[in-house]
């Protein structure tokens, strides 16, 4: 299932929001989001279930919840504007959807950066079937 997310990222093209999110992740972590965050733990990548495994996985859980709260928006494909200076990401002008999507992505990227010290390579490409705990509500 998470492999589909990676394929979706590659098919969206350079204008897609997922690639903008990947760029934000690179700014905050100096890591490429696709291998490091596209299939990490129980929540990073497509979908999510169970309990977040660590602080990085919780960043993804919160990001998923942020996207869920957006109505009449397409968070994985809408294009937004943002800038960065000295490691600070600033969401730019745009529609209410674009601004909210950008803010969801910005908060997640900052969260990833803040939790680099606890990132566990053993949670990369974590199999969904191991995420069996009851899921939290947003």
UniProtKB/Swiss-Prot annotation:
Subcellular location: Secreted
Source domain of life: Eukaryota
Cell membrane recorded as keyword: no
Keywords of this entry: Calcium, Disulfide bond, Hydrolase, Lipid degradation, Lipid metabolism, Metal-binding, Myotoxin, Secreted, Signal, Toxin
Amino-acid positions noted as binding Ca(2+) in the UniProt annotation, renumbered to this chain: 43, 45, 47, 64
A GO cellular component annotation in the UniProt record: extracellular region
Keyword field contains Glycoprotein: no
Pfam families the record matches: Phospholip_A2_1
InterPro entries: PLipase_A2 (IPR001211), PLipase_A2_Asp_AS (IPR033112), PLipase_A2_dom (IPR016090), PLipase_A2_dom_sf (IPR036444), PLipase_A2_His_AS (IPR033113)
Entry's Gene Ontology molecular function annotations: calcium ion binding; calcium-dependent phospholipase A2 activity; phospholipid binding; toxin activity
Tissues and organs where the protein is expressed, per its UniProt entry: Expressed by the venom gland.
Chief localisation class: secreted
Cofactor info, note text: Binds 1 Ca(2+) ion.
Active-site residues (renumbered): 63, 105
Names of the cofactor(s): Ca(2+)
Disulfide feature: 42-131, 44-60, 59-111, 65-138, 66-104, 73-97, 91-102
Subunit structure: Monomer.
Job of this protein: Snake venom phospholipase A2 (PLA2) that shows myotoxic activities. PLA2 catalyzes the calcium-dependent hydrolysis of the 2-acyl groups in 3-sn-phosphoglycerides.
The protein, known as: Basic phospholipase A2 Bs-N6
Organism from which the protein derives: Bothriechis schlegelii (Eyelash palm pitviper)
